[in-house]
């Protein structure tokens, strides 16, 4: 049995990133799900092409793994322009930003992942670049310091964030197109898994794809990660074909239950129940008890637990729901913090 398999791991290895890139759709036609977002982007992109100008700046926000990077690449492909990728933490100082911006060709797309992590000083420099296609930078230091203005080619900034609430109001206001990505339903994920299996030349039954989809937390990145692991089991424990039996066997071995919850999800719920009588309890306290980063819990784990009804946020903190007790086979604490059984 494989232990501590984190299907939401943010730091991908080179091999895993190559795997993801091989499965990415390159145009709107091949992109599944997010219908409203895609339909709107089709119109915005077509209008920009008709006017032969840069597309307005785009902000994509939502939980990890829903296709923000893929959509950004598709935007560039559909516009027929260059595509450059960077991230908020990488742009450490204004000179880093200036180097990227001055390398852009007219109407290119610049993708900044984790844009909420831009340093305040870099963000200030970005304002004029987004509005006026120019940037002012300081040359030298002390008495000889002077400011020079660099003219930039028109470009489209696509910013991606999993925590849109951390964006400053001035930065958010400079995005003309603001789009939120939702979790995917099982039918769409099933089609994504079958497409990925075809690309990987792995036979995969429809029911098996549906089984993987139902445990993928509404997230294509997780669906593809699970497909890769189930493929391993199919090749070693089976005939190489992914059927529903081998899919279920593999997912159980990976501790992915029928709700898509893994060992860490269940540990969060159990900690709140066992140590804090079901809550409410503060996020920082939960993080300390688990030895996890509070931001990671809030950004990576909580959204799905809340969406599926296992956890809720209250003014006094996090609290597990009746569904969580039922899922874990636990008794429920009443409001006086005494136990009772149904």
UniProtKB/Swiss-Prot annotation:
GO cellular component, one term: cytoplasm
Subcellular location: Cytoplasm
UniProt-listed InterPro entries: AAA+_ATPase, AAA_lid_4, DNA_helicase_Holl-junc_RuvB, P-loop_NTPase, RuvB-like_N, RuvB_C, WH-like_DNA-bd_sf, WH_DNA-bd_sf
Enzyme Commission number: 3.6.4.-
Binding site for DNA: 313, 318
Primary enzyme class: hydrolase
Ranges where the record places region Head domain (RuvB-H): 258-342
Binding site residues for Mg(2+): 69
One GO biological process term: DNA repair
Keyword field: ATP-binding, Cytoplasm, DNA damage, DNA recombination, DNA repair, DNA-binding, Hydrolase, Nucleotide-binding
Pfam families with a match to the protein in the record: AAA_lid_4 (PF17864), RuvB_C (PF05491), RuvB_N (PF05496)
Quaternary assembly: Homohexamer. Forms an RuvA(8)-RuvB(12)-Holliday junction (HJ) complex. HJ DNA is sandwiched between 2 RuvA tetramers; dsDNA enters through RuvA and exits via RuvB. An RuvB hexamer assembles on each DNA strand where it exits the tetramer. Each RuvB hexamer is contacted by two RuvA subunits (via domain III) on 2 adjacent RuvB subunits; this complex drives branch migration. In the full resolvosome a probable DNA-RuvA(4)-RuvB(12)-RuvC(2) complex forms which resolves the HJ.
Family: Belongs to the RuvB family.
Function field: The RuvA-RuvB-RuvC complex processes Holliday junction (HJ) DNA during genetic recombination and DNA repair, while the RuvA-RuvB complex plays an important role in the rescue of blocked DNA replication forks via replication fork reversal (RFR). RuvA specifically binds to HJ cruciform DNA, conferring on it an open structure. The RuvB hexamer acts as an ATP-dependent pump, pulling dsDNA into and through the RuvAB complex. RuvB forms 2 homohexamers on either side of HJ DNA bound by 1 or 2 RuvA tetramers; 4 subunits per hexamer contact DNA at a time.
Domain notes: Has 3 domains, the large (RuvB-L) and small ATPase (RuvB-S) domains and the C-terminal head (RuvB-H) domain. The head domain binds DNA, while the ATPase domains jointly bind ATP, ADP or are empty depending on the state of the subunit in the translocation cycle. During a single DNA translocation step the structure of each domain remains the same, but their relative positions change.
This protein's name: Holliday junction branch migration complex subunit RuvB
Organism for this UniProt entry: Phocaeicola vulgatus (strain ATCC 8482 / DSM 1447 / JCM 5826 / CCUG 4940 / NBRC 14291 / NCTC 11154) (Bacteroides vulgatus)
Gene that this polypeptide is encoded by: ruvB
């Amino acid at each position: 049995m494989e232990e501590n398999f984190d299907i939401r791991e943010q730091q991908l290895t080179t091999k895993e990133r190559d795997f993801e890139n091989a499965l990415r759709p390159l145009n709107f036609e091949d992109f599944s799900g997010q219908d409203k977002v895609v339909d709107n982007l089709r119109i915005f992109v077509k209008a920009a092409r008709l006017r032969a100008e840069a597309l307005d700046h785009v902000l994509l926000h939502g939980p990890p793994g829903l296709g923000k990077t893929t959509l950004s690449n598709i935007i560039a492909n559909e516009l027929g322009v260059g595509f450059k990728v960077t991230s908020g933490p990488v742009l450490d100082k204004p000179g880093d930003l200036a180097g990227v911006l001055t390398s852009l060709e007219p109407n290119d797309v610049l993708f900044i992942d984790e844009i909420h992590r831009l340093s305040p000083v870099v963000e200030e420099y970005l304002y004029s670049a987004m509005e006026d296609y120019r940037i002012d930078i300081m040359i030298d230091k002390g008495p000889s310091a002077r400011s020079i203005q660099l003219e930039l080619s028109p470009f489209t900034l696509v910013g991606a964030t999993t925590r849109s609430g951390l964006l400053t109001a001035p930065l958010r206001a400079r995005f003309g197109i603001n789009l939120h990505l939702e979790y995917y339903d099982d039918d769409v994920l099933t089609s994504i898994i079958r497409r990925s299996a075809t690309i990987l030349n792995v036979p995969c039954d429809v029911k098996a794809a549906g089984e993987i989809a139902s445990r993928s937390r509404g997230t294509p990145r997780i669906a593809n990660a699970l497909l890769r692991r189930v493929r391993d089991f199919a090749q070693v424990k089976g005939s190489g074909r992914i059927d529903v039996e081998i899919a279920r066997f593999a997912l159980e071995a990976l501790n992915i239950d029928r709700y898509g919850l893994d060992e860490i999800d269940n540990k969060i719920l159990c900690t709140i129940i066992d140590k804090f009588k079901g809550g409410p309890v503060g996020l920082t306290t939960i993080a300390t008890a688990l030895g996890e980063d509070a931001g990671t819990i809030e950004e990576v784990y909580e959204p799905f637990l809340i969406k599926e009804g296992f956890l809720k946020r209250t003014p006094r903190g996090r609290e597990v729901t009746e569904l969580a007790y039922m899922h874990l086979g636990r008794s429920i604490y009443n409001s006086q913090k005494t136990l009772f059984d149904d």
